[in-house]
Amino acid sequence: MTEHTPHDASRRDLLAAAAAMSLAAGAPAAAEQPSSPARAMAGKPSIVFAHGLWADGSCFSKLVPTLQAEGHEVICSQHGLDSLSGDVDCVVRCFGQVSGPIVLVGHSYGGTLITHAGVDPRVAALVYLCALAPDETETSQSLQAKFPATPVFGHIAVTDGRIWLKRDGTPDFCGDLSPADQKLVWATQAVPVPDLFTQKHDGVAWKSKPSWYVVGKQDRTVNPELERFVAKRMNATTVELDSSHVPMLSQPAAVLDVIRHAARSIKT
């Protein structure tokens, strides 16, 4: 005899409702791209964000409302930091939720993600924020190893199979934010598996896509010299800010200007 719990019933109700909605819309509608109102915004490029370690999509919260108000479709990937390939796939899935062409923006490890995901033909431009940008022979780790380690790595702990940023590490991660905002950053951190930075993936988008790069001159998480190195290597339009590792939170107006320049370069 099979016992049905209230949870089972709720799940059946949810599945039934989803099936009914699909039938009501018709099978072709399920595969449609964004709706007509969304396509009405297609005169401007869409913006897709990819976060890094010890962050989630909310790290772009000071950018998203302004870009939306200016007529861009915007979405933030919420990847789990479980595997490089899985994170890249998560970013690519976001492309189907907006009308291209896409300005793909990556922060920190998110730069590795946009480097690989950005080879998708829907992506027209790349924006790197204090970000990694490995070549085809590099991993995130091997790229970092070419430069002196930064102070933040003295404030991490591996617990329960994840790498956590300790509370006392926030000054080296986001030290130009208020104490209250630093606490918020720590509380919303997404944490990676220990081997994430040693994993590899195909595709180097910055070799074929126009790129912009924001260097954080006071970055104590990704070495600013690494940032300058990869920006020069990709021939990026480069802006240096007197910021920590999180310029999108501490200097959002300047970061918005960079994204706008990238968007204006795209013919829609």
In which residue ranges do the predicted regions lie?
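C-terminal segment of N-terminal export signals and the immediately downstream linker at the start
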Residues: 26-44
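Flexible "cap/lid" loop of the alpha/beta hydrolase fold
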Residues: 122-123, 127-159, 166, 193
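N-terminal secretory signal peptides
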Residues: 1-9, 17-23
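Conserved HGGG/HGGXW glycine-rich cap/lid loop of the alpha/beta-hydrolase fold
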Residues: 44-84
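Gly/Ala-rich beta-loop-alpha elbow adjacent to hydrolase catalytic centers
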Residues: 106, 110, 114
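Conserved loop-alpha-helix segment in the C-terminal half of the alpha/beta-hydrolase fold
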Residues: 217-241
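Catalytic active-site module of serine/aspartate enzymes centered on a nucleophile-bearing elbow/loop
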Residues: 244-268
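Short beta-strand/loop motif that positions the catalytic acidic residue
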Residues: 213-215
